[in-house]
Amino acid sequence: MKYKFTLSVLLSLASLVSAARTVTNPVIHGDLPDPSVIRVDSVYYATGTSSEWAPHYPIYRSCDLVNWTHVGHVFDRKPEWTVSSFWAPEIVAIDGRYYVYYTARRASDSHSYIGVAVADRPEGPYTDRGPIVVHGSEAIDAYVFDDGDGRRYISWKAYGLDPRPIELMAARLGDDCLSIVGEPFTLMRDDEHTLMEGQLMFREGDYYYILYSIRNCCGFNSDYAVSAARSRRLEGPYERCPANPILHGGNDEIKSVGHGTLVTTPEGERYYLCHAYMEGDDFLCGRQPVIYRMEMGDDLWPRFVGGDDARASVTAPAGCRAQGGVNDFYDGFDSDTLRVDWSWNYPYSDVKAVCRGGRLLLSGRPLTATADGAALCVRPARSTYSISTRPVGCTSSTQALTLYGDENYALIYGMTGHRLMITLRADGREQVLADIAAPVESPYLRINVDGGLARSFEWSANGCRWHRIDLDGLSDETLRSLNRWDRVTRPGLYHFGSPTAPAAFDFFRVEYR
């Protein structure tokens, strides 16, 4: 009996140890594509694509690669030379300073090129130093590589918009890390027409290695995957791994996976932080950061622990803490400044958000001929949730909840004067789905979202007893169309009207289910 009891205890302990050695992807919940990560002593910092949302390039911090905290952004406002499409930032630590090499469209011609910003701390503040790679009609997805012999190189994807094969290119980085010297050269060319981007480089033994992403990055048909190549010379030629792709989705948990960077833990483990679309309803949370442990095989090719089939459950980094869950979001606007979680639709509105006296005052000035409102939103961390608020402004402006894709694709539910309205904007056309007299002066409003799609719209006089507004004809296809090719719908608050007549909100809440 004593033997059986001891064996039972040992088996239970073994089970706990085993459970503690796995974590569940994503490790950062919400849309944060193309993540880049560094380790500074025992602390990790990550950033990623912000696309058409400001502030630009969120910065996260972690002590274990698993539990992350949003601590800031690279830019609060876009750099003067840029206009939009803030993609694929690469954060690098060099000689005690921190550099972010980022992709953005140039204001003068809307071509995407690579800029650089510098800070004394990984959290910032960052000072923009302008474009560093201006090559052809497009240069995106920067990666900085130290060859171990005192030389640094910057690589990028080229010719993605031209009628010719895509190339991964590189150039020597100047000693100031703010310029390139010499002529760019080709690392690899996409002669197989699989598409090619999101590269990283490392050197081990006699080889230079490139991990790169292939196929379609974004949207409902994404089949992104990770391939590998190696060469005995930095300049190539590179041979492709016979086992490519070495990491892919296409299963019942992960739809697609790719575009990331490697980081080494204090224990010497190497992890690849990249993004993935989850399969099922959480697809509509966007491209979320995930981790996979990488090792070198006996054949001198990189491989991922657990195999090439990307899964949600993965080997945990040594010493990581218990993985936290997803928390509800609440802002009562009691601070003088916005919480770091908020983002706004900078291409379409000059958004002004002021916290005053426990209320948010939201307004905006349209920046395009078709733009008409200011959206202040958060990233959804799950696909099933409710959002609620209470408009309290005495204004003729629209004060509303929104599920926002962009200026042409949004759901808007709120007060316009004394009317309670639900409006659908799809493909630039606006359709009023409901228009009723406001049942009370300042109703509480709620949208219930299931599987990433709005399912019901409710109002309440007191925030406790809710009344549903009946709707017909709002199809799943229409709701899914609100998601843009490279980003998903964000829930938040909306103002439409004169910039001098702001919307006022008592609170904003996201409750996950």
Cite the ranges covered by each PLM segment.
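Hydrophobic h-region of N-terminal signal peptides that target proteins for export
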Residues: 10-19
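Bacterial N-terminal signal peptides that target proteins for export
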Residues: 1-9
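Carbohydrate-active catalytic/glycan-binding domains of CAZyme proteins
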Residues: 19-513
